[in-house]
Design a protein with these regions (language model features):
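Extracytoplasmic copper-binding redox domains, predominantly the cupredoxin/blue-copper superfamily
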Residues: 1-124
Length: 124
């Protein structure tokens, strides 16, 4: 979709899937379907070749448990099966990529608290 009054060129840069590169016309409310064959192991950049300052990040998963945190840094993931799981924490600006192993008990709730140096999140 493109709610802007100008065209954009969407260019994806996945590592494991084929990238896409297509134009999206102004005020396009339909959008363009993009699919991925395999899951990616980390987010990949999406850019606009017309407007080089525009970018976004996407993560193609093979499960429904991906989440973005709130402005306060919190998130909830529901319906995770019991067992050992790996949580991946990623942030493009602070260049954070960490993994944390967690155990989910049957019908249980697990909390994960991580703190990061706030100075890493300042705009360049």
């Amino acid at each position: 979709m493109n709610s802007d009054g100008v065209s954009h060129n969407t260019h994806t840069y996945p590592k494991r899937n084929n990238g896409d590169n297509f134009a999206v016309s102004p005020n396009n409310s339909t959008g363009v379907a993009v699919s991925f064959v395999v899951a990616e192991n980390r987010p990949f950049r999406i850019g606009c070749d017309i407007h080089g300052w525009l970018q976004a990040w996407q993560l193609a998963l093979d499960h429904p448990h991906g989440r973005r945190n709130t402005d306060g840094g919190k998130f909830t993931i529901e319906s995770i099966p019991a067992g050992q799981h790996r949580v991946v924490i990623w942030h493009e600006l602070a260049e954070i990529l960490e993994t944390v192993d967690v155990t989910i008990e049957v019908d249980g709730t697990t909390s994960l608290n991580k703190a990061f140096d706030a100075s890493k999140f300042k705009l360049p």
